[in-house]
């Protein structure tokens, strides 16, 4: 992990890093993009880490960002199907990992936030997540807690009364941009030239991934890096198949409610049917009905269950879903808005097994065994 460690030396020195290409990534990943408006420093990262883990920022004092994005669970809340917020309230979506979220061009499953800074503000005030009525309780804490006051002054050169949610969001985002992980057996095999790094089943699975499985169409691998996502949105038949008969009535009613001021962030996490509208809830484009963001496959073996709704329990279930053409069982009706590339694959049992083995080879070393928070954040191995 030398490339990442070297980048962290610059952060630890408190250096303001260059625009948009600041933190070198580990083997297999590109540099982490850093916005010009939110340069990285070690002090800002440390502040963001504390904010990320502070349970006082929920209405019950029992939930933090880390509750659903647990470092010990690859920054998810595995094995929960959908996340639990305050008072054990259950939302509609599976918690996506924060690992490598810095590389996404949109945040949330439906892409309703453009960046980590914007994304970080919403869970605080969602009724089924952290349940605050507004952001004022957070500002009250950070403006009065002596340690926060000192940290915000050091990082942003601001007095307590001038601390804003923008400062909070910037610090959390800075912390999240340090949570990157590559250097998997696949990376060592493909980018490091170590042909012994993957076992035979994973090597065969890699060929299925590139060929008959057609996985690489969306989970992109490039010559010198692999994000394993195209940063686009697709209807792959998960979730929306259950509500397809409701769509003619549901979609126009949602658009009408949205025009009247419906809070989309709250609606998609509280109403299961509304949640399944996917990217359509943001863009209102019929071609994005039931479409969700392509997740990265890095460390996917550590983040079960799968899909935006957690409806598929194992990696084998996921492969079978695609092999059946976007349905759990062959012969089931597919929705009318299924993305064009989704069709039956006719993979053999051996190919399915090998494909799972390949995805397991995408696990970074810090997630291959019980991890420590310091190792995860620093990008090293425990």
Can you say where each PLM-predicted feature lies in the sequence?
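Bacterial N-terminal signal peptides that target proteins for export
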Residues: 1-13
